[in-house]
Amino acid sequence: MVNKVSQFVRLLRSTGRERRLGTVIFFVTSRCNAKCETCFYHEELNRPGDMTFEQIERVSRTMPQVTDLWLSGGEPTLRQDLDDIIRLFVENNGVRRVIIPTNGLLRSRTRAMVENALSLDGGLDLYLNVALDGYGMTHDRVRGVPGNWGRTLECIRALYPLKERYGDRFRLNVNTVVCAENYAEVGRLADFMWENFRLDGHYFNVVRGETKAGDEIKQIPPEVLPEMYARVSALTERYGGRMFAADDAATRFVKSVAYVGAITTHYRTQHSNFAGPSEWPFPCTAGETTAVIDYNGDVRACELREKFASLPDFDYDFGKLWEAEGREAELRRIDEGRACWCTHVCFIHDSMRHSRRAQLWEVPKNYLTRARW
């Protein structure tokens, strides 16, 4: 037990606590080949004005070192120079983790992108989060694309050889947005994917923002959530067992506490904020440790907030924009989350990992209480 505690403490110490920029969420294009009812970004889709590669290059050159780069959209694989964009941030900014959400409709392009990225640098990890928002026809209906379900499953299978080649450097995940259309079949979808696909993780996030379908798609009965969260928390533990199977018992235990405890903390924070604002158990660090860059160069502290500055106004010099008064004013408006609230897992996670209280108390506590909802 002493050995397990020592390993857990070392794991906590390896997680950075300094409140400086470490995660960038970059909407590389507004183009999308789906029509998702749950999309919070629908008003910005398929518009002109994507930044050019030259403009992105200047942004990267003037940005500090960051560890995590999310490449979103739109559908990020529609951007033809996506491989070059990844290379830019790896070479200029020392990115260690690239996280890409995708609808899985472009199988060949997705596979080539993953392979090209992982061949760049032996120290780079890539997390591909494939969207599945229901079982079978439900997924097609929510996504607005007939045949999407089958094409996405084919895309997942096509990535198995890369998973075998790159091992833990390539995390192949599924992400499900829970909404009024699919909450009743979360269990069926979760079991099907666990039993039939070689995934590293399957994550469930309640619908957020001003969606294309309006408020109707957000009408999940609150009474179904405890059972759902209990089920997906147990699923998270099973995936953790799969991911860490090769480790010795002590290491496997430590990683399980950290992983399952963190994901359960995400879910508990989302659950407590489902119907209305509830204070997070740690300060929100949006705009300090995270930045959101839109396809046209607008910059936001959080995906759910308005822009506080625009890169074209700073000649695409990210450093100048980041140090300007506009960001400081936005941080005062956010007030570490006291002045706004959300269920956005990206910001829950990044805020959590910069909080000693979260790491030393919330994560272990939520691991121990993972079955109680």
Kindly give the residue locations of the regions a language model identified:
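Hydrophobic/aromatic residues in well-formed alpha-helices
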Residues: 56, 152, 318-321
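Flexible mid-to-C-terminal extensions adjoining Fe-S/redox cofactors in radical SAM and related proteins
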Residues: 19, 42, 278-283, 292, ...
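Conserved alpha-helical substructure of the radical SAM core
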Residues: 2-125, 210, 220-224, 355, ...
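Radical SAM enzyme [4Fe-4S]-AdoMet core and its adjacent flexible, acidic
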Residues: 121-286, 290-295, 299-300, 305-313, ...
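Alpha-helical membrane-targeting segments
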Residues: 1-21, 242-273, 351-373
